Amino acid sequence: MRVVGLMSGTSMDGIDAALIDTDGEEVQWLGAALTLPYDATTRALLVQAMEDARGINHRTDRPGVLRAAEIRITDLHAQAVRQLLDQLRLTPSDIDLVGFHGQTVFHRPDARLTVQIGLGQRLTESLGVPVMADFRAADVAAGGQGAPLVPVFHRALVRRLSLPHPVAVLNVGGVANVTVLDGDAPPVACDTGPGNALIDDFLFARTKVPFDADGRTAARGTVDEARIAEVLAHPFFRQPPPKSLDRNDFRLFVGERMGLSGMGLEDGAATLTALTAATVAALVPLLARPPASWIVAGGGARNPTLLAMLVARLGAQVSVDVRTADTVGWSADALEAHAFGYLAARALKGLPLTFPTTTGAPEPMTGGVLFRL
């Protein structure tokens, strides 16, 4: 079936929309994709929504600006789908399903609570197409971490490649997550630590620029290894998979341990970028076997400084091959959007989305809620 997958990640920079042909088991093809960037007003609304979400006690709570943000992003997701279809000279009648992740504003699996804002019924009524949404809730309610969700999609893609195993697929969004695939063994997955979020927030606070384009600011700075070691002492980095993070979990901790307020712009950016690489490398000793191949996707794949730091830190442990998703025929920018198209098709068939080795769920679990006209 033809599915449009939608993703608005923790970097909060925009909506990725991507077309995929899949039956929820095999991937027939990965189609075109686009990004609908958030304007400054929408991003500010989402930043405030993240703050207001701290008052959530139940997954239906919408304190502060959350209701307004939910309506706004739903309508923008509809716009993203229409733009993608227009680009391809298609209409909504040409697709079978939409996979709608929504925007994560609160993620506390220890409290069995995760909230992704987005109105599935409003989206299906706008587009006239069935919508699968709310992918994480069932896993979290059962005691799983609710993240990462994409490992089963990574497994379907990696099966088509001829790369030395184990293969690690690293997505560097606001939070970084990894899937480790080793032959026929169940996929192992977890969040590794901060991805782009801390770097983006630091740059924006200092310069009002939303991200470090091409890692140029970090490339001019000097990494403070002692401050990175302070952060790596946190118990999270010694905890084996599965494990997950909220976007803001390390914001205060890193700010205090690194003394970011006292660091210059370039050195702060360099040290935060190196921290992302270091937290990925810190996972390797916790795995049964070190990955021989790494495929990097997400915004981090567009940051040459981060990629160089990853190569240096991963290569210090074992000889590895690090490449970006684009080099294996995937879209580094749209991989998660493609994933949610795949997961939507999978959920429609009642197939498992998560596994004990990926989220800590007690058993393989399906998920998602289907919205129809």
Swiss-Prot record:
- Entry's EC annotation: 2.7.1.170
Asked whether the keyword Transport is assigned, the reply is no
Q: Look up keyword rRNA-binding and say if it applies.
A: no
Q: Which InterPro entries match?
A: Anhydro_N_Ac-Mur_kinase (IPR005338), ATPase_NBD (IPR043129)
Q: Where does ATP bind?
A: G9, T10, S11, M12, D13, G14, I15, D16
Recorded metabolic or biological pathway in which this protein acts: Amino-sugar metabolism; 1,6-anhydro-N-acetylmuramate degradation; Cell wall biogenesis; peptidoglycan recycling
Q: Name one Pfam family in it.
A: AnmK
Task: Give the superkingdom in one word.
Answer: Bacteria
Give the signal peptide, or none: none
Q: Which reaction does it catalyse?
A: 1,6-anhydro-N-acetyl-beta-muramate + ATP + H2O = N-acetyl-D-muramate 6-phosphate + ADP + H(+)
Please provide the record's keywords in A-Z order: ATP-binding, Carbohydrate metabolism, Kinase, Nucleotide-binding, Transferase
Per the similarity annotation, which family is this?
Answer: Belongs to the anhydro-N-acetylmuramic acid kinase family.
Q: What is the protein name given in its UniProt record?
A: Anhydro-N-acetylmuramic acid kinase
- Which species? Xanthobacter autotrophicus (strain ATCC BAA-1158 / Py2)
Highest lineage ranks of the organism? Bacteria, Pseudomonadati, Pseudomonadota, Alphaproteobacteria, Hyphomicrobiales
